[in-house]
């Protein structure tokens, strides 16, 4: 017995030692994160190809490459491609090739992506398009002979490219001639040099001539549309709409193929789907020059795979996305939201429509009060090449697989085509991301994230059984970290409405102690927190903060009414939901009421500004990509509110409503030291309508404030910005809270940093005379 006790003591000591060796997560661990995206299962169901995303060596961007793993598990994933920017892998119907897109780098920046093919029998991949604007979204024809894709090239681009190639060929020949040896070796060196010089001069002259003849391209823009730029994409180019192209699938690098443009016109096209017999291609478009004056609608077209005029099949009075062809080729499934009544938020549903002229679509999930095709979000989805989902038909056409959001979780489910009834395929506190099935429907592969795991790949038998984990992308790193599971709580708001929230506590949390609190508010406003990895929250907790992240009214995953209840009242009662959550934690006894912080991004930035204008209880705030003035935002955002979704009228017709709901209106009430995090190319919430206003007003009022600006960063800074910028963002947020909640010295946020403090009054320095 004594020996057993001694043995158990040794084991306990070993476990304790292993635990002690773990460290807290840091902001810079992001540099070592690995993301898994866009899984594609082989036709025979034996393997999955996926995109592996990592931070590049300079920590200024991301590398993406294709990897493969068997669906049966038991093997480590292995790398298929070695490009820095490979993505969108798509298996050929016979499983012998993978088409994908690759963007090569020039001068440190990715060029337009081109279509490439990887032979699965062995050998290197090869590119087979060379289009000025690149190519994307490859789709194999059913017979595997042709690939459809989208591109925004126009005839002018192609003509310029051809002209440039001809010039380069002329220069190449001239340079080759100039470097050739003298044909008369018997001549003296001086004479030989004189003989070669005219050729060299000719080459230089050709270069200068080409430069002189290069057409000047104006860089001004004449804008006639209300929507003229998009966040993360920049200013829109009406001369380059996205169209449908096809190209013969080459079998090797020596086979030269010529892409063919199938559609044309001034409107974008997408959602490409091949007909079952490969004779036609279906796609969606909207032939309206200024769609913001109307409610959303989607037009479905068909074009012959050999080319010709497109035929409009249907006009759907909703915004349809993610088309999927039924096994018999007679129906399309898609996701879409109704447009009437005009809501602030309308849940997407799963629809089916016959491929017959003007057929009426059927809402499969009309009575299913959840968000189809969406769920919870975090800060660590793959920052590049994540891919997307489409509803997947069962082989017999009797069911469809899709994800939905429910109370902080994202669930994969099967929906009965006849009844709309749902059967959950995944369970537990997690968020399903991307999913695919094998051709026979027997195997489902999908990505999953949890509160302590960045997405990994899993395989699940469609007829039931336990999921099998195929990748362990971050296990080596995470095994070294003290990550804590958040506590799910619920509380009643002022009107009795139940609010769900999560509490991220520090490692080795002690309920007898008092901790500073950070209230973290999500954006959207129609979005949801939940069981998904949040690097930001884990790091805040590791730094000694308790983090509260609630889903106030207006959040998704709680039904249509809960999501839309804030229409024309945002901000409003959602603020009360947030304060009720803070009160709930304070009642639990482990929060220091004098050390309350608040932060949030986008809609969360708006609410952060709102909070500090409504209550002085917070000792520090960080508003990120925020809104200060609804009126200024109405005029400058990258999308319009011409429809009465968030406001009943424009600001010049209802100034009082815009003013009443704008945080800047209440700036005179603010006492909280506040930082503003801004992306300089954020077109979703432009800095001039948000943080710049708040910062200037607080400076006038002599309230401590700082503005942190991130060059070349859009609204997506926190999720897909440059890695260094993402890390610096976290450092500044926590740094500000450290200063005001922890009492840390942060001279970088002082008007006069310590090394530039003016001399004391009793010093020998004197004020220089006026000159």
Give a label for each model feature:
Residues 63-64, 152-253, 284, 294-301, ...:
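Predominantly five- to eight-bladed beta-propeller fold
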Residues 58-64, 106-113, 236-241, 291-298, ...:
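Short, solvent-exposed loop/turn segments at conserved positions within beta-propeller repeat blades
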Residues 28-64, 238-242:
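Beta-strand-rich domains and repeat architectures in extracellular enzymes and scaffolds
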């Amino acid at each position: 017995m004594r020996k057993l006790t001694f043995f158990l003591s040794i084991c306990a000591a070993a476990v304790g030692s292993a635990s002690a060796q773990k460290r807290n997560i840091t902001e810079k661990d992001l540099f070592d994160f690995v993301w898994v995206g866009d899984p594609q299962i082989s036709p025979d169901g034996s393997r999955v190809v996926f995109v592996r995303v990592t931070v590049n060596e300079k920590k200024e961007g991301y590398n993406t490459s294709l990897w493969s793993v068997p669906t049966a598990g038991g093997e480590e994933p292995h790398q298929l491609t070695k490009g820095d920017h490979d993505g969108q892998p798509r298996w050929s119907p016979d499983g012998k090739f993978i088409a994908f897109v690759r963007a090569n780098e020039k001068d440190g920046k990715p060029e337009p992506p081109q279509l490439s093919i990887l032979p699965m029998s062995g050998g290197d991949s090869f590119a087979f398009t060379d289009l000025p604007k690149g190519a994307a979204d490859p789709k194999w024809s059913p017979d595997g002979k042709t690939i459809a894709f989208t591109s925004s090239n126009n005839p002018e681009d192609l003509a310029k490219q051809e002209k440039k190639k001809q010039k380069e060929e002329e220069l190449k020949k001239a340079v080759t001639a100039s470097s050739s040896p003298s044909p008369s070796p018997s001549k003296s060196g001086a004479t030989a040099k004189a003989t070669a010089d005219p050729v060299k001069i000719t080459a230089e002259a050709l270069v200068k001539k080409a430069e002189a003849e290069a057409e000047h391209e104006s860089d001004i823009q004449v804008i006639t549309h209300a929507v003229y730029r998009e966040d993360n994409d920049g200013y829109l180019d009406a001369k380059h709409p996205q169209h449908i192209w096809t190209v013969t699938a080459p079998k090797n690098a020596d086979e030269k193929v010529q892409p063919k443009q199938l559609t044309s016109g001034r409107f974008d096209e997408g959602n490409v789907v091949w007909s079952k017999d490969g004779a036609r291609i279906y796609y969606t478009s909207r032939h309206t020059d200024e769609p913001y004056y109307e409610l959303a609608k989607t037009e479905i077209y068909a074009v012959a795979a050999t080319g010709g005029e497109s035929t409009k099949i249907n006009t759907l009075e909703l915004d349809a996305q993610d088309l999927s062809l039924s096994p018999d080729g007679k129906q399309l499934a898609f996701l879409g939201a109704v447009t009437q009544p005009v809501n602030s938020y309308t849940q997407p549903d799963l629809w089916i429509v016959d491929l017959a002229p003007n057929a009426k679509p059927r809402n499969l999930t009309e009575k299913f009060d959840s968000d189809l095709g969406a769920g919870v979000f975090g800060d660590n989805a793959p920052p590049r090449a994540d891919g997307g989902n489409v509803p997947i038909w069962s082989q017999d056409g009797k069911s469809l697989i899709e994800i939905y959001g429910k109370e902080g979780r994202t669930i994969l489910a099967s929906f009965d085509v006849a009844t709309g009834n749902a059967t959950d395929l995944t369970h537990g506190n997690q968020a399903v991301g991307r999913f695919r099935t094998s051709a026979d429907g027997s195997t489902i592969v999908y990505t999953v994230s949890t509160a302590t795991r960045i997405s990994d790949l899993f395989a699940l038998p469609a007829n039931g059984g336990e999921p099998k984990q195929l990748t362990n992308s971050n296990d080596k790193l995470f095994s070294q970290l003290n990550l804590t599971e958040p506590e799910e709580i619920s509380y009643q708001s002022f009107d009795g409405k139940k609010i769900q929230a999560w509490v991220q506590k520090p490692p080795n949390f002690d309920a007898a102690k008092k901790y500073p609190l950070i209230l973290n508010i999500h954006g959207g406003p129609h979005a949801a927190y939940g069981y998904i990895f949040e690097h930001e929250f884990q790091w805040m907790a590791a730094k000694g903060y308790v983090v509260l992240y609630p889903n106030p009214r207006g959040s998704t995953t709680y039904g249509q009414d809960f999501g839309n209840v804030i229409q024309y009242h945002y901000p409003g009662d959602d603020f009360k939901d947030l304060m009720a959550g803070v009160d709930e934690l304070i009642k639990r006894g482990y929060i220091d009421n004098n050390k309350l912080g608040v932060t949030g991004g986008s809609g969360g930035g708006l609410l952060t500004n709102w909070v500090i204008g409504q209550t002085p209880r917070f000792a520090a705030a960080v508003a990120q990509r925020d809104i200060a003035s609804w009126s200024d935002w109405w005029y400058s955002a990258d999308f319009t509110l011409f429809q009465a979704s968030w406001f009943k009228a424009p600001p010049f017709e209802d100034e009082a409503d815009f003013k009443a709901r704008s945080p800047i209106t209440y700036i005179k009430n603010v006492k909280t030291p506040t930082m503003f995090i801004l992306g300089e190319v954020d077109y979703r919430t432009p800095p001039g309508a948000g943080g710049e206003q708040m910062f200037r007003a607080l400076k006038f009022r002599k309230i401590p404030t700082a503005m942190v600006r991130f060059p070349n960063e859009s609204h997506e800074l926190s999720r897909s910005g440059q890695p260094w910028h993402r890390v610096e963002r976290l450092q500044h947020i926590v740094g500000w809270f450290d200063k005001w909640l922890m009492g840390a010295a942060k001279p970088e946020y002082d008007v006069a940093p310590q090394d530039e403090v003016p001399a004391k009054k009793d010093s020998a320095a004197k004020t220089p005379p006026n000159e």
